[in-house]
Amino acid sequence: MPGAVSATPPPELATAARTLFGDRLSLAVAYAGLLVTDGVVRGLIGPREAPRIWDRHLLNCAAVAERIPLGSTVLDVGSGAGLPGLVLAVARPDLSVTLVEPLARRTAFLVEAVAQLDLAASVQVVRGRAEEIASGGGGVEPLTGDVVTARAVAPLDRLARWCLPLAVPGGRLVALKGASAVEEVAEHAAIVDRLGGGRPEVHHCGAGVVEPPTTVIEIARERVVAPARPKPAKRSRGGRRR
Ligand SMILES: C[S@@+](CC[C@H](N)C(=O)[O-])C[C@H]1O[C@@H](n2cnc3c(N)ncnc32)[C@H](O)[C@@H]1O
């Protein structure tokens, strides 16, 4: 088909793909196939992303697996087309992964992708916002995980507010970030502390395998902090709420 994008890794990335996906490489190729066809047609992946689906998306996300302990439960917040959560589930059959995404069009794609890749035993899709999932609001069942992942969802302060309550005590937020990681840490470390998080750490994943390595900010959930209570409305002299 003219213009069709191949789902197999380009030759220069074949070694990295084998290293990161091992004997699950054919499953990763099947997922890439869904992304570059259905994912593009349904508007989950930009057409310009299709030719770089391996280096910018699949390998970039799979590199983060090295930061996730064996047998972890993972909540991927703002999964979109499954990045990084579905990639991690493909690369790591030991993980139990929940893909959290508020938009129905995206969760529909995710549910179909999970079924087509035969991953239903280890992956569930939950429609909702991170802040609802933490509190059990909006009719969504409250969930927590050992590791909470997020890529391209929000700046670090908002991400910490949404995601730290989703990590079990002692669990971690692993946020995939770009070149801004060090500045984001400097800017938001005080807020993270107030939210019960430990000192944010910047790690580079996949060094020597993917170029450039994937930068992540990791924050441990050290303390459980009650959510901020809404401020009471100001009263007028007559004691009535304004
Ligand atoms: C730019 S997309 C990134 C998607 C995917 N993580 C990726 O890297 O391709 C941001 C995603 O976050 C989702 N999102 C936005 N606010 C959210 C919230 N409060 N809770 C959970 N997901 C949210 C959006 O619906 C969207 O799918």
UniProtKB/Swiss-Prot annotation:
S-adenosyl-L-methionine binds at G78, L83, A130, E131, R151. It is found in: Cytoplasm. Keywords: Cytoplasm, Methyltransferase, rRNA processing, S-adenosyl-L-methionine, Transferase. Its main location: cytoplasm. Its EC number is 2.1.1.-. Pfam families: GidB. The keyword Transferase applies. Belongs to the methyltransferase superfamily. RNA methyltransferase RsmG family. NCBIfam families: rsmG_gidB. This is Ribosomal RNA small subunit methyltransferase G. The gene is rsmG.
